[in-house]
């Protein structure tokens, strides 16, 4: 009995000095997905998917957009009378055009290679309008009567501001031969047109000559157009049509015009004074007096995140568009407060801290650390070195992911004419395919990195555990839950030496050996006592059973229930 009491006293004494290795926990409810699991609660996480915008059109890097309101690009460049506010425009960061602007080609017709012209604008930030052929220089032709009720201004007939519709003068239309030399250092955008009358009577009334042409030539262009006279349905009250053309005139090049009728001559041209990243965006939004780095048709984005799911079309320094609803990177640990007392699952990359059944909410100044208890008390202490290394590693990884993904990335709608619908459909399918690939890559990246991060934390906890185990050796007992029981007294100074890696094993080894042997001896003696008691119990119970059987047999024989015969 004295041995048992001594054993219990020793066990009680040793249990009072313990050190445990554990990790931080908090009240976070943030969840992430990994390759192996979904909705894993973690202590810290970082969202890398931007989902919000401001619903406005903003300046990009301080430069306002050119918002054409009810005008189209064609209406702006040709000078539709209803677009006079855009006759001279400052530098723009991008151009905004509505889906179906009402002020486009007021006189019905067509704009040749219109989609290519819009593509040109995607690399232009500023035009300077200059006069190349003054209206007053057409002394042999009528340069003021070429107007139409289809292009009204202040209740009167008018025409496009930047071109001149030349008609006969004094019943004559002399052949035009006019040249312009580009002496500027910049490229010039030049526009002109040809008129297609409704019938022969209109042809001779306007131009006198029944058979006419318009010829244009530069060092790279050789074009000859002939009017097509035909009866057509009226559009905007007009049966005639106009067809507009454009070209880029390089510095030191010349453009030559020759025509004997139906010529719509250029008065102004556009000097391309600044090239850069621009685009034409389809949107009905108004300017919001704001500044941003990234613009979408539904609003501006101000974000450093690498991905967004707001709109596939963007302009500026934008995150990459993905179709995902959620992309969250784990930056902290699995959040398993100790009260839950459930074992952690092991991950794909070898999560190895599953022997610890919960985190500590009491440890707030680090991710990994210690809890000790001895005669002087108990407390938590973070291992700041391993915590800082982990923070630096994860921060660098997150920043690396963001830097690699968050490059200047923009995608704008491409323009196709009616003859290119199959190309447009193919282009849309290809873009959808690219978006699917981007989305898959982004989601897989997040799942893989989250798995690695959580396993990285588990590995750090295990490394801390091994650091303590290798120091203590047989001076302490592993309890299997991340804790060690000392076989010797370990005061606060001793605990600190374990934590900082300076534990003096020889100093405590003799005390630990004696306590360990004492506990082992008590265990052996108790085991011998238990064996004697078990033998005695077996013999006694067998003897009692034999006596009971003999008594029962005697009783049954005496009352005749059992016949007993003894044969010799």
Swiss-Prot record:
<protein>
    <recommendedName>
        <fullName>Hemagglutinin</fullName>
    </recommendedName>
</protein>
<feature type="site" description="Cleavage; by host">
    <location>
        <begin position="346"/>
        <end position="347"/>
    </location>
</feature>
<keyword id="KW-0325">Glycoprotein</keyword>
<dbReference type="GO" id="GO:0019031">
    <property type="term" value="C:viral envelope"/>
</dbReference>
<keyword id="KW-0348">Hemagglutinin</keyword>
<keyword id="KW-1165">Clathrin-mediated endocytosis of virus by host</keyword>
<dbReference type="InterPro" id="IPR000149">
    <property type="entry name" value="Hemagglutn_influenz_A"/>
</dbReference>
<dbReference type="GO" id="GO:0046761">
    <property type="term" value="P:viral budding from plasma membrane"/>
</dbReference>
<feature type="disulfide bond">
    <location>
        <begin position="58"/>
        <end position="290"/>
    </location>
</feature>
<feature type="topological domain" description="Cytoplasmic">
    <location>
        <begin position="553"/>
        <end position="568"/>
    </location>
</feature>
<dbReference type="GO" id="GO:0016020">
    <property type="term" value="C:membrane"/>
</dbReference>
<keyword id="KW-0449">Lipoprotein</keyword>
<feature type="lipid moiety-binding region" description="S-palmitoyl cysteine; by host">
    <location>
        <position position="567"/>
    </location>
</feature>
<dbReference type="InterPro" id="IPR008980">
    <property type="entry name" value="Capsid_hemagglutn"/>
</dbReference>
<keyword id="KW-1170">Fusion of virus membrane with host endosomal membrane</keyword>
<keyword id="KW-1168">Fusion of virus membrane with host membrane</keyword>
<feature type="lipid moiety-binding region" description="S-palmitoyl cysteine; by host">
    <location>
        <position position="557"/>
    </location>
</feature>
<keyword id="KW-1161">Viral attachment to host cell</keyword>
<dbReference type="GO" id="GO:0019064">
    <property type="term" value="P:fusion of virus membrane with host plasma membrane"/>
</dbReference>
<comment type="subunit">
    <text>Homotrimer of disulfide-linked HA1-HA2.</text>
</comment>
<keyword id="KW-1160">Virus entry into host cell</keyword>
<keyword id="KW-1162">Viral penetration into host cytoplasm</keyword>
<feature type="glycosylation site" description="N-linked (GlcNAc...) asparagine; by host">
    <location>
        <position position="181"/>
    </location>
</feature>
<keyword id="KW-1032">Host cell membrane</keyword>
<feature type="disulfide bond">
    <location>
        <begin position="106"/>
        <end position="151"/>
    </location>
</feature>
<comment type="similarity">
    <text>Belongs to the influenza viruses hemagglutinin family.</text>
</comment>
<dbReference type="GO" id="GO:0055036">
    <property type="term" value="C:virion membrane"/>
</dbReference>
<keyword id="KW-1043">Host membrane</keyword>
<dbReference type="GO" id="GO:0019062">
    <property type="term" value="P:virion attachment to host cell"/>
</dbReference>
<feature type="disulfide bond" description="Interchain (between HA1 and HA2 chains)">
    <location>
        <begin position="20"/>
        <end position="483"/>
    </location>
</feature>
<feature type="glycosylation site" description="N-linked (GlcNAc...) asparagine; by host">
    <location>
        <position position="39"/>
    </location>
</feature>
<dbReference type="InterPro" id="IPR001364">
    <property type="entry name" value="Hemagglutn_influenz_A/B"/>
</dbReference>
<dbReference type="GO" id="GO:0075512">
    <property type="term" value="P:clathrin-dependent endocytosis of virus by host cell"/>
</dbReference>
<keyword id="KW-0472">Membrane</keyword>
<dbReference type="InterPro" id="IPR013828">
    <property type="entry name" value="Hemagglutn_HA1_a/b_dom_sf"/>
</dbReference>
<feature type="glycosylation site" description="N-linked (GlcNAc...) asparagine; by host">
    <location>
        <position position="27"/>
    </location>
</feature>
<keyword id="KW-0732">Signal</keyword>
<keyword id="KW-0945">Host-virus interaction</keyword>
<feature type="glycosylation site" description="N-linked (GlcNAc...) asparagine; by host">
    <location>
        <position position="26"/>
    </location>
</feature>
<feature type="topological domain" description="Extracellular">
    <location>
        <begin position="17"/>
        <end position="531"/>
    </location>
</feature>
<dbReference type="GO" id="GO:0039654">
    <property type="term" value="P:fusion of virus membrane with host endosome membrane"/>
</dbReference>
<feature type="glycosylation site" description="N-linked (GlcNAc...) asparagine; by host">
    <location>
        <position position="500"/>
    </location>
</feature>
């Amino acid at each position: 009995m004295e041995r048992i009491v001594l054993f219990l006293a020793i066990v009680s004494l040793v249990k009072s000095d313990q050190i445990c290795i554990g990790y931080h926990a908090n009240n976070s409810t943030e969840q992430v997905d990994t390759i192996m699991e979904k909705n894993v609660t973690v202590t810290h996480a970082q969202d890398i998917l931007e989902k919000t915008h401001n619903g406005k059109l903003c300046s990009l890097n301080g430069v306002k957009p050119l918002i054409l309101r009810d005008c189209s690009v064609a209406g702006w460049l040709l000078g539709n009378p209803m677009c006079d506010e855009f006759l001279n425009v400052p530098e723009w960061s991008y151009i905004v055009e509505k889906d179906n602007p009402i002020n486009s080609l007021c006189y019905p017709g067509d704009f040749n290679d219109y989609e290519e012209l819009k593509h040109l604008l995607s690399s232009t930030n500023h035009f300077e309008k200059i006069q190349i052929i003054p209206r007053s220089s057409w002394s042999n032709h009528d340069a003021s009567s070429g107007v139409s009720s289809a292009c009204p201004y202040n209740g009167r007939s008018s025409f496009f501001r930047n071109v001149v519709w030349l008609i006969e003068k004094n019943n004559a239309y002399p052949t035009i031969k006019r040249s312009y030399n580009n002496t500027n250092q910049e490229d010039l955008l030049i526009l002109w047109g040809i008129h297609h009358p409704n019938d022969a009577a209109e042809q001779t009334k306007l131009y006198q000559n029944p058979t006419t042409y318009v010829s244009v030539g530069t060092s790279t262009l050789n074009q000859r157009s002939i009017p097509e006279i035909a009866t057509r349905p009226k559009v905007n009250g007009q049966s005639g049509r106009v067809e507009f053309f454009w070209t880029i005139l390089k510095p030191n090049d010349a453009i030559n015009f020759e025509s004997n009728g139906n010529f719509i001559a250029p008065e102004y041209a556009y000097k391309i004074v600044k090239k850069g990243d621009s685009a034409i965006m389809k949107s009905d939004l108004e300017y919001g007096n704001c500044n941003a780095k990234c613009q979408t048709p539904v609003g501006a984005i101000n974000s450093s995140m690498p991905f967004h799911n707001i709109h596939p079309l963007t302009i500026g320094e934008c995150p990459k568009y993905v179709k995902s609803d959620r992309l969250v990177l784990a930056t902290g640990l699995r959040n398993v407060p100790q009260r839950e007392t459930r074992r952690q699952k092991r991950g794909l990359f070898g999560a190895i801290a599953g022997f610890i059944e919960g985190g500590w909410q009491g440890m707030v100044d680090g991710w990994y650390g210690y809890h000790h208890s001895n005669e002087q008390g108990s407390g938590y202490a973070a291992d700041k070195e391993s915590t800082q290394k982990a923070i630096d590693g994860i921060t660098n990884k997150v920043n690396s992911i963001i830097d690699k993904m968050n490059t200047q990335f923009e995608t704008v709608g491409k323009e196709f004419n009616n003859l290119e619908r199959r190309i447009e459909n193919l282009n849309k399918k290809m873009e959808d395919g690219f978006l699917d690939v981007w989305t898959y890559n982004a989601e897989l990246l997040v799942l893989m990195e989250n798995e690695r991060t959580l396993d990285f934390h588990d590995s750090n906890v295990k490394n801390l555990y091994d650091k303590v185990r290798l120091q203590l050796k047989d001076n302490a007992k592993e309890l299997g839950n991340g804790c060690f029981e000392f076989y010797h007294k370990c005061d606060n100074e001793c605990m600190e030496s374990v934590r900082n890696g300076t534990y003096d094993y020889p100093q405590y080894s003799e005390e630990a050996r004696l306590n360990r042997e004492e506990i082992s001896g008590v265990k052996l003696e108790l085991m011998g006592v238990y064996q004697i008691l078990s033998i005695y119990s077996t013999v006694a119970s067998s003897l009692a059973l034999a006596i009971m059987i003999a008594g029962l047999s005697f009783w049954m024989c005496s009352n005749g229930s059992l016949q007993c015969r003894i044969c010799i």
